[in-house]
Regions:
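C-terminal catalytic/substrate-binding lobe primarily of soluble NAD(P)-dependent oxidoreductases
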Residues: 145-223
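Rossmann-fold NAD(P)-binding glycine/threonine-rich loop
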Residues: 52-68, 75-104, 114-115
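Rossmann-like NAD(P)H-binding beta-loop-alpha module
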Residues: 91-95, 99-165
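Conserved active-site and cofactor/substrate-binding residues in soluble primary-metabolism enzymes
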Residues: 35, 43, 56, 60, ...
């Protein structure tokens, strides 16, 4: 944590697992950090950003913060597709906001869907482009060399290549838009920016889709 603050030129941070010490630092505007995520709900902050990507940790931290009447913004789609509706209700019950952050595919795609609907267009398909090769039998060991070359955690890269991340994000998009998945596992064809409208046309028009109003993804020069 200290190194992160130093790299950003923010000086020295107070690192502690003592709530009173952290709250004192917060009160004086001093950067503060902790190794115990489960005390965050006790800190004197208005908004908590949960970005672990770990469903269990995210669920515990987020629910505790909502119960403490703190707004929570998440970059944890893995948690959101699991218990997002429950957390949304908890937030409403406590008069605070629970929201998925802008920046990742589900929310950005949702914004485009809402824009199209505002203009009274029918949404045939919404989704994302996948810029990693689809290797469903990947393991952290098989992608380790590539991951280290990219300064990534092999487990994280594996979740990209084996399709886990894409499937999770598209479930989130389906949940929030009301669109259905095109089929179990989705089609995931190769495409490009110039050919997207042809690839995701209905089958009767030469595309892959058997019906409109679905979520899917593609690979290729689109991301």
């Amino acid at each position: 944590i200290q190194q992160a603050y130093a790299d950003l030129g923010l000086g020295t941070a107070v690192i502690s697992d003592d709530v009173s010490v952290l709250n004192e630092a917060i009160a004086t505007g001093t950067p503060a950090g902790t190794t115990n995520a489960f005390i965050v709900s006790q800190l004197n902050v208005d908004v908590v950003i949960e970005a672990t990507g770990v469903p269990e940790v995210g669920a515990r931290v987020t629910s505790a913060c909502l119960n403490a009447k703190k707004h929570v913004a998440v970059l944890n789609v893995e948690m959101d597709v699991t218990i997002g509706p429950l957390l949304t209700k908890m937030a409403a019950d406590h008069g605070v906001i629970y929201a998925v952050c802008h920046g990742d595919e589900p929310v950005e795609a949702l914004a485009l869907v809402e824009f199209a609907r505002d203009l009274s267009f029918e949404v045939i398909m919404a989704g994302k482009g996948k810029n990693n090769p689809f290797e469903p039998f990947s393991t952290p060991d098989t992608v380790r060399e590539r991951a280290l070359a990219k300064h990534m955690n092999p487990k994280m890269l594996c979740s990209f290549t084996d399709g886990t991340k894409t499937m999770t994000e598209m479930v989130a998009l389906a949940n929030t838009t009301g669109l259905e998945l095109s089929k179990r596992g989705m089609y995931g064809p190769a495409s490009s920016v110039k050919t997207l409208q042809d690839t995701f046309a209905l089958q009767k028009d030469g595309g892959v889709l058997d019906r409109p109003g679905v979520v899917d993804y593609c690979t290729g020069d689109v991301a």
